[in-house]
Amino acid sequence: MHHDAGPLRIEELDAVRGFALCGMLVVNIWRITDIAATDESGVVLPIRHTLSVVFEGRFFPIFSFLFGIGFALLLDSAEERSERPRLVLIRRLLALGVIGLVHQQFQPGEALLPYALAGLAILLPAAALPNWAVLLAGLVGTFGVALALGGGLALAPGLFLLGLATARAGIVDTLDERGWQIAAVFALALPAAIVAGRWEYRTPYLELWSTPAVAVAGLLGALAYVTGLLLLLRIEPGQVLAEVLRPLGRLALTNYVGATALILLAAPRLGLSGSGSYAAVLGLAVGIIAVQAVCSAVWLRLFEYGPLEWVWRCVTWWTVVPIRRTRVPSRPY
């Protein structure tokens, strides 16, 4: 079985990944800078509560779901190209774990190391299961955790499985033919996300993580964001946005780690660490996204992979992969 992802399909996934990366950066930057969430009297700042409803919990599920899709595509590629496909997957996850371990020294709470561990513990065994079982486990894992634990990183394994099941069901292969289905999901997800977002906003900020409000609103918001973006990418104005997001998505690993370095370098010099200036912190986030978008686009004119993506790929296939750009389209995994 081989999912040969066509140009439109992979470009759409890259754009969605780039979109998720931007949203995660906004959330990560206020965590890294430790920006104040309350005023001097201990009352939560309205802007923090509003930004939480717009950003927090919305982009992490997208990234996790895409991780499961990527695992499925890599598995297909490994089965085609290697006599020991599971060893290929193990190397990829171990390499990600090492990168995550180093990254965690600078950004505690980062996602790469948990992704690698969950991939080894859950995705690898799940790859041997029938797809209906993977889908069922993904649904139970995602929504069960959302209701019982209130979300967070615990949602990742279920979302991994949903991504794996989606790719194995052939939906990724036929994404460009599913415009009406995407529109139907968006039409249902958007009002549901708005209702859930109002529920989250009306829940006292300091009580959010003891209720399922964040997880439920986050999952519905993520679904509305993704389907809305996919619809936007199919019309002419969306192509401009796609040109910005795709390079960011192709270099997602490099940009995710690189953003941490840029935040740690810039925040103290700009006096943002521990401050209450959300405008300045959000301005820094926009600046980092702009710099990374330009650098990613320029880099991809010369090279096939980002720096960390290239290292990751070399370890995955246990060979030195050519990095210079050629006329022959590269494989996504």
Task: Name each model-derived stretch.
Residues 2-333:
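Alpha-helical transmembrane segments and their immediate juxtamembrane cytosolic regions
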